């Protein structure tokens, strides 16, 4: 009991039962299938429920994993030039503070170098097209950008090639290690999606998650 201090162990077990992580038969307590998946994939309670709820709604696995975790370590390659043109202190991180507001103000775009403007418009047309009231701070841009990274990987591009493609098309740079780490996490999350979908008899979601996982693994 020293290990738990004053914490009521019985209450903890009850809570884990309510979460459907544990089941009790007499004096025997075991992990449920759902509980085993959560434990082996080191999922937080909130992530576990996000996956379960999305699976029950039969959301696409790509959408599920990109909602779970955004790739936000993206930088504007031409941040210094943009800052000079607009006479502002321009943050280099794409998804930071007012960066998107600064650039995608109509007046701002007209002051940019033609090449940079085309890159910014390409970014806007691919990632800033949602109708959310809070756009661009609704999370849709990050989610779509994260989807793009995974889709490029499914085209058999290595992290180095993905970084190059992002620079060429959007003027956005990223570190290969960050891209690799994100894809590695996506594989783990897709595995969890597949297994949780099987537990809840959502065969279509499970199959799609399995196929996507294999493509990302390469």
Regions found by a protein language model. Name each.
Residues 10-217:
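C-terminal helical accessory/scaffold domains
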Residues 1-7:
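Short helix-coil junctions and helix-kink-helix linkers
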